[in-house]
Amino acid sequence: MTPTNQIHNALYLPFQREQWAELRESVPLTLSENDLADLRGINEKISLSEVTDIYLPLSRLLNLNVGAKQQRGLALNEFLGRVPPKRPYIISIAGSVAVGKSTTARILQALLSHWPEHPKVDLITTDGFLHPLAELKRRGLMQRKGFPESYDMKGLVDFISAIKAGEAAVSAPIYSHITYDRVPDQFQWIRQPDILIIEGLNVLQTGQDSAVDTKRPFVSDFVDFSIYVDAEEELLKKWYIERFLQFRTGAFSEESSYFHHYSQLTDHEATGIASKIWDSINGPNLTLNIQPTRERAHLILQKGQDHLMDQVLLRK
């Protein structure tokens, strides 16, 4: 048994796909094929059967956890004799570039919003808290974009702490994958949702991962339930290259795209560049910063070929 398997056995309850699907019980499928088409990411072939087998049981688990948290809050408030501000239940979704975090987040948002106990579910991505391009260039971090140091961590933590404190309206910067930068003077406003889903590469990071300040709070300190979307690196690199090739004929073809110069590449040239980007940036970031946080997650979704989930690990 490998050390990783030993850790998994010690910390997690493993479920094969069929076992996990049985935990759905009577939760209804509230998404149509058209709904799912709007939620799919680039290069993902997720089906309604995947939603039924994997995401419906997960939405049931999260609904139970949200209810338990709400009941604990009511008991504490009765004891203290106070009416506190509304505080959302916070779910984080972490994982590598190209693993499908955004699709997982969108599907969970859609499913959880159909539960009557928590109809208002908001979703943000940490991309908006990347330093602006000009600042990344000034700091010499353009080849480290996505690494922890490329983020405005203070701004991100201030944002999520304000959410957790129950502030009525909190703003987050908006990021454009076309311009590869923050959108100037545009913000996403979060107004006391029942649930907030926050998706990003490093949302499971803690103080012990920081070379700068081990004592300051991190996103993970404010999260109620954390999910890590996992896959073998060989698959991740393959998916990244496939996605890059699709972007080349899609988003990259727009004149305003930061990567417009890639749109004229041949398949062979584009594959070579995507592979180099993975090997020099995304792969090292996965190995050094993202994957080491995996075992902090409450739940790990393990993907195999074609983005299909083949195992779920639930923390004991």
From Swiss-Prot:
<keyword id="KW-0963">Cytoplasm</keyword>
<dbReference type="Pfam" id="PF00485">
    <property type="entry name" value="PRK"/>
</dbReference>
<dbReference type="InterPro" id="IPR027417">
    <property type="entry name" value="P-loop_NTPase"/>
</dbReference>
<dbReference type="GO" id="GO:0005524">
    <property type="term" value="F:ATP binding"/>
</dbReference>
<protein>
    <recommendedName>
        <fullName>Pantothenate kinase</fullName>
        <ecNumber>2.7.1.33</ecNumber>
    </recommendedName>
</protein>
<keyword id="KW-0547">Nucleotide-binding</keyword>
<keyword id="KW-0808">Transferase</keyword>
<comment type="similarity">
    <text>Belongs to the prokaryotic pantothenate kinase family.</text>
</comment>
<dbReference type="InterPro" id="IPR006083">
    <property type="entry name" value="PRK/URK"/>
</dbReference>
<dbReference type="GO" id="GO:0004594">
    <property type="term" value="F:pantothenate kinase activity"/>
</dbReference>
<dbReference type="GO" id="GO:0015937">
    <property type="term" value="P:coenzyme A biosynthetic process"/>
</dbReference>
<keyword id="KW-0173">Coenzyme A biosynthesis</keyword>
<keyword id="KW-0067">ATP-binding</keyword>
<dbReference type="GO" id="GO:0005737">
    <property type="term" value="C:cytoplasm"/>
</dbReference>
<keyword id="KW-0418">Kinase</keyword>
<feature type="binding site">
    <location>
        <begin position="95"/>
        <end position="102"/>
    </location>
    <ligand>
        <name>ATP</name>
    </ligand>
</feature>
<dbReference type="InterPro" id="IPR004566">
    <property type="entry name" value="PanK"/>
</dbReference>
<comment type="pathway">
    <text>Cofactor biosynthesis; coenzyme A biosynthesis; CoA from (R)-pantothenate: step 1/5.</text>
</comment>
